[in-house]
């Protein structure tokens, strides 16, 4: 491809509304353009990258035995009403009516549509298991679209849905999708981690997320420094660093603690180690009208998802108001603790191993110091309630935990029978009895992968594409292309490289565009290999080569260039 026949829309300045680096570079490299909030047009350069992601995804899904379909983006409300999600989904679901006043939505996901397809097309156990996938545009009406492709309103996803008679069958397909996803992200050249995850609003049981590691990531992911253990921060199991509770060395005593409403005030005001303090948080109980106290160590944070999963606790999690707390306990936040607590209580594992600790006395402006379990009060229910912190033991007993930022680009779920029961999807078993099908769901944010790749691979000059994603493999930059010798040599090399199957962008812009601008554009776009053809080099029988990740260029004999490039691109 020649730049004279191509849309090369690079920008020198960074648009003011672009915050994250992927958004900045996608705009500056001429890959996307904003149409409206959260809506983007893919320009030719960016579309080449997007299509490469789609190709790899499609190849691995086909290899895993999934069948490609294409479902409508606009979906009838009746299907969402059947599943119960029409009322549940919230304002992110863009709803509309046609001229006949029939209600529809623009699909943020396709569980209802695929379940409807399956109940119309599947009628026998002999057709199972089966796995359908599509690569389709989705729409979620985000309240604040931001970060370009990272959190837009319209985006492209690969979503797959599998159907099974048994949990064992689902597990086999789930494991196959896990392997397929690992192959996809490996082929894309990304540094990623598959992590145990919570199912969220989709529902179901088992779940893994696939995260691209990047400092700009929105999610904290946790993994062992000595094993394959990995989970997101919501799911990661918090193992206490202590193996046993220490012995009591203090008597419990009541202490006046005026104006001490925070852990920081308690620690600073009374010279206490923060590890000897606790936080008591009060939430609504699962039984209507009840409250439950959740207690974590002063230097730890409550994990709200773990808390909401406790049988005694209402889900979704609702924190009690100060008025509710005072009515039930007789004291307000900042003075709460487990001693003589009149409501149900759950303590974190680390709290259960504490000794000689300080706790609110459930009396305004008073704390107990020197509190010890069993001696001063019985140990209540114990559960994993907190977020892990870096350096915690790995739950598998191998190494310690490291926390890094990640960008979620894939998610696989074991949905169970949530949708098949709601929408009456069943087939006849081998015994002739109707059986609700068990489902799996597997998504990849195809357009988000493009942004995530940039977040992980860039420098001060522009994008550093993994080789599988670069829009072109080679940039040919002739100096003084209007010179006959340079033009002939460039055209000959261009023909040889394209005939060999390489993707080449020939920068044949005229002399009004300086060599420096051409070099800067090719680096901004992120083309991995640059070859410069000049009169001086031709006279010396060499061409200048520079890899996008190289600090220095090198001169290569003209006759060796093809073998050199072939070897480089075959790695």
Swiss-Prot record:
Task: Please give the chief subcellular localization of this protein.
Answer: cytoplasm
**Record's Gene3D superfamilies?**
Anticodon-binding domain, Bira Bifunctional Protein, Domain 2, YbaK/aminoacyl-tRNA synthetase-associated domain
Q: Which top-rank group of organisms is this from?
A: Bacteria
Cellular compartment(s): Cytoplasm
Q: Which UniProt keywords apply?
A: Aminoacyl-tRNA synthetase, ATP-binding, Cytoplasm, Ligase, Nucleotide-binding, Protein biosynthesis
By its UniProt entry, which Pfam families does this protein fall under? HGTP_anticodon, tRNA-synt_2b, tRNA_edit
The first-level EC class reads ligase
User: What reaction is this protein's catalytic activity?
Assistant: tRNA(Pro) + L-proline + ATP = L-prolyl-tRNA(Pro) + AMP + diphosphate
* GO CC, alphabetical: cytosol
Q: Which PROSITE patterns match?
A: AA_TRNA_LIGASE_II
- Name the EC number(s): 6.1.1.15
- What are the GO MF terms of this UniProt record? aminoacyl-tRNA deacylase activity; ATP binding; proline-tRNA ligase activity
One example of a Gene Ontology biological process annotation:
prolyl-tRNA aminoacylation
Subunit details for this protein? Homodimer.
State its role: Catalyzes the attachment of proline to tRNA(Pro) in a two-step reaction: proline is first activated by ATP to form Pro-AMP and then transferred to the acceptor end of tRNA(Pro). As ProRS can inadvertently accommodate and process non-cognate amino acids such as alanine and cysteine, to avoid such errors it has two additional distinct editing activities against alanine. One activity is designated as 'pretransfer' editing and involves the tRNA(Pro)-independent hydrolysis of activated Ala-AMP.
> What does the domain comment read?
Consists of three domains: the N-terminal catalytic domain, the editing domain and the C-terminal anticodon-binding domain.
> Which PANTHER family does its entry note?
MITOCHONDRIAL RIBOSOME PROTEIN L39/PROLYL-TRNA LIGASE FAMILY MEMBER (PTHR42753), PROLINE--TRNA LIGASE (PTHR42753:SF2)
The UniProt family comment states:
Belongs to the class-II aminoacyl-tRNA synthetase family. ProS type 1 subfamily.
- State the name under which the record lists this protein: Proline--tRNA ligase
Protein species of origin: Pseudomonas aeruginosa (strain UCBPP-PA14)
Taxonomic path: Bacteria, Pseudomonadati, Pseudomonadota, Gammaproteobacteria, Pseudomonadales
